[in-house]
Each structure stands twice: as structure tokens, then as C-alpha cells.
Amino acid sequence: MRADGRARRKGRRAGLIVLAATALAGCGGLGGPAGGTSPLRTVTGGPARAAHRSRPKRHYPSFPVVNGLGTLGPRWHPVVTVRGQTAAWIAQRDGVTMLRFDQRLVRLVLHAGSADPGSGPWQYGDTIRGSERRRLAAAFNAGFKLDTGAGGWQSGGHVAVPLTAGRASIVTYRDGTTDIGAWQHGIPTSQPIASVRQNLSLLVDNGVAAATVNSCIETCWGATIGNAATVARSALGIDANRRLIYAATPSATPATLAQGLIDGGAQRAAELDINPDWVAAYLYHHGRGLPEFLPVIPGQYGVAGHFLAPYTRDFFAIVER
């Protein structure tokens, strides 16, 4: 019995020593290198388990997130994110405000106005509604009135005004990608087409402004209020990385608008509408109820309803893919 008692006491002392050593090792008390593996853990033969926690899956909003315009300047800075990635940037050069869109994250949608082109079998009508509204990032004006002879208009296989060869054309394909070029001169490709909006000739081609931007202002680039050369103007371009660039200004000549686009990286561009009543762009902040609109162009007059209510003229929306 005494031998058994002594054995039990020795066993208890050995256990206490092991526990104490383990505690010291956990506190770094065994003199091992900082952050290193404790020698005791290796001796005990237990599996070394790294303190690893799986990161929780990140959940992104189901709508584009607008970060605000910030201070406008020549450097591009993010204004819209989609699923945590930058989908739109903003910059301003020589008074020309530009929005640049990543077509991998967003797509362009051509809307028919209630008067221009008017009622018809259009998939996208005179206001942004339903699921499109929930995915809305931006919207802006389209081109001249269709009765001015500036070009054709087509959507969903239906033609409001016949397309004209050589006209600057904003072509959106059914896969959601958009290209800009002269009709039947490089575009369209063989892909199925969703919509085409034509307006005048290319303002920018191969990164160079049209030769007429200084010499043929009203005849080539549209009649202005009071025959002024410097008025509100807008355009849509595309850069070498297939990003779309909307450009607008409350006061510019065609040459100034073209140069702003070129400085922003545009390779090709079509002029859109001009004069202050018809040049407008918005970003949209999502919350409860109707999206809140954020005017993009300093000094813009804006349009009634901000494209969230029926509008008479056609326009473009930028929506999350």
C-alpha cells in the first residue's frame, strides 16, 4: 500500500510539472523564439493546429453603390461600385465632365421617349421602372430629335427611323456590350443587335477630333440657341479598353468637347444632344423607395422627372449586369 501511495504521489507531481510546463510554453516562458512553435508541443506529439478562421463570405448590395461625386478634377476617381468592384469613374478636364463605365459590370440601355420616337413596340419606354430601376447606376440624354435628319433609331428589331450608312452609331448588342463607330464602316459586327442610336458623324475617330469641329460648327454639329458656338453639349465615346465615356459640359464648342473626350482616352465618339434644356446626366443612390438622383454636370438644367418619370425624349440608362 505504501509503495502504491508513493507511486500515485509521483504520478501527481509529474502531471503537475507537465501542466506547468504547458502553461509556461503558452506564455512564451520556455524561452522559444517569439512567434515560434513551442518545443513542448512538438514533444507531446499532438497535431500542430494553426489558429485559422475562415473569413465570412462578403455580401454585397443587390444594387449599384454610388460613392458621391467628390471634387471634380482631371484624374479619374471611382463613383460607382458593383459587387465591390469599381464600375464607374468621374473626371473633369477643361470644363468637360466625364463618366467612364466598365462594360464588364454595367451595360447601356436605349430608352424610347413618349414623343421621340413615340409609342411603339419598344422594350424600354419613356421611364426607368421595375427591375431595371433597382439595378440603375446612371442615366443621360441621347441624341438630336429624330426629325432633324441626324440619323436613325432602332430597338429590339423595330425601326423608328431607318439607319444611314456612315452616321456615328451607338450600337448595343444583345450580349449587353456597346460599340461606337460609323455605320457600315467597321460596325456592326455579325452579333445580334439590341439597339442602334445614330447622331451626325463621328466627333472623334481613332483618337482624333473631326476636321470640322472648328470650321463647320452649326451646319455639321447642330443648330444652337441664339446661333452661339459655345453652348451645352454632350457626347458618348469608347476607349481602347471598351469602356464607355459620357462627356458633357454646360458651355463648349465641338472642339472643346472632342478634346475633353480625347484627353479622357476616347478612341471614337458620337456627339449627343446640345443646348441646355436637353443635356443632363444623373447618378442614382439606392435606399428605400425611389432612387435618389444626383446631378452630374455642374450647372445642368436637368430634365423633368430625372428619367424616373415619363420623359418625351429618348435617353440612355446604365444598369448593373
Where are these regions (language model features)?
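Active-site neighborhood of phospho(di)ester-bond hydrolases with catalytic His/Asp-centered motifs
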Residues: A269-L272
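Bacterial N-terminal signal peptides that target proteins for export
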Residues: D4-L16
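Aspartyl protease catalytic domain
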Residues: A112-D263, Q267
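Active-site environment of divalent metal-dependent phosphoester hydrolases
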Residues: D147-T148, P276-V279
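C-terminal regions of proteins
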Residues: W278-R321
